Amino acid sequence: MSCVKTEGVQTDKNPMGMDINTPEIMQPRAPVKPSKELRNGGRVKSNAVAPTGVYLPNNNIQTPNMTSPEYVQLSTAAALTLGLMPGSMYNCSCTRCLNLLLTYPEGCRANCAYCGLARHREADRDYADRNFIRVDWPAVPMTQVAEIVAKQIKEDGDTPFHRMCISMITHPRSDEDTFTVLKTWTDHVSPDDVMISILSNPTTMVRDDLVKLKDMGTDIFTVSMDAATPEIFDRTRGKGVQSPHTWKKYWQTLEEARDIYGKEKFGAHIIIGMGETEYEALSLVQKIVDMGGHSHMFCFFPEQGSLMDHLPATPRDQWRRVQLGRYLMDYAGVRVEQMKFDELGRVKDFGMPKAELDMLVDTGLPFQTSGCPGKFAEDISACDRPYGDSPVSDIASYPFKPEGAHMRKIRQQLDMEKPGESYEQGEEFDDL
């Protein structure tokens, strides 16, 4: 993938020429059931190829039989930072969050329409070879991961990672194996050196699981609501795509996280551009703020192989407005009731004096990746997910502080250009 390639996805307007993705547009395909021999990791289990250390996803060879808790998958950014695979990222020397993903031959048993890990892909490719948030996820022995980070701390006094996050999936073993993976980690690395987050799977969890994870050192507990409304949730994560998740259970788990972890120690993921209005998205943000939590935003991008890979990415105008609104609500005390919206639910006024708003926009902070904080500041995410929701050619969530041409581009997208300043297409890459 080229750093400056658009990858064929338009992000200024959708096919209807609008700067928002409406429900009429964002309809996933119906899932097709794989043949019986390919279900539940049948290809991997029948061939039973033994794993040998690090496995880099390769759809041209037989995938080894790798299983958590002995094995986990890492984001490409984490693997690069650990030195487990070659390469570099545009304007990023490393990622500050070590994202771990549980792995099984059967894969995730959910069928979320926008996700590259969804169950319907069994016929397409084996679980460990599937793309997720636009990148490959190499598989590595969990002990090896923990030993590398422990060695960094011992020899250098520090590690690039501010935080480690275990991403659970929908699988009968994922609850118990999460405890084992976490124990392997804390046996090597103290939570005082690297903070711990859990990206949970509410469908299989009970309240005692949340308590146990906290007792084991977890700092922040997050829930992937993903959809901004119950209707979109059901269409993309529930019965609409033959998937087991329900809005009710996810919201219940978020409330339990509030009670167990406390203020600002829980959060929810929200994907923008799946058919919700900006008002609906920011109303959900407000509910979470009122609970004492934070929202972690993702910009919808059509994941290759998913049931929504034929749909348009979120128009940047829509994304920037929600991104800015979310930051104002989370960190500047603005409430959704202070904002004004048009008849299509688009933000028309952010509820803040123009001079103050301009100063805040100029910091670039609202447009950086949102997630669990690291060691720099509460409003700077350790989980920077480099280019997980956009190509580099049209960055949605900045894994670095946007300045210069990047800020001019953002201001153009917000229709907030400064007098005498303008953005020229592609100028942010002039010095590459």
Model regions: which residues?
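Auxiliary Fe-S-binding modules of radical SAM enzymes
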Residues: C3-E7, D12-G17, N21-R29, K33, ...
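Conserved mixed alpha/beta catalytic, RNA-binding, or beta-rich assembly cores of soluble enzyme
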Residues: R109, A118-R125, W137, D156, ...
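Acidic (Asp/Glu)-rich catalytic clusters
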Residues: Q152-D156, K212-M216, D259-Y261
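Alpha-helix-loop-beta-strand connector modules within alpha/beta enzyme cores
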Residues: T178-D193, H245-K263, R316-G333
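Conserved strand-turn element in the central/C-terminal portion of the radical SAM core barrel
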Residues: M195, L199, T203, K239-G240, ...
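Catalytic cores of alpha/beta
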Residues: V206-L213, M274-D290
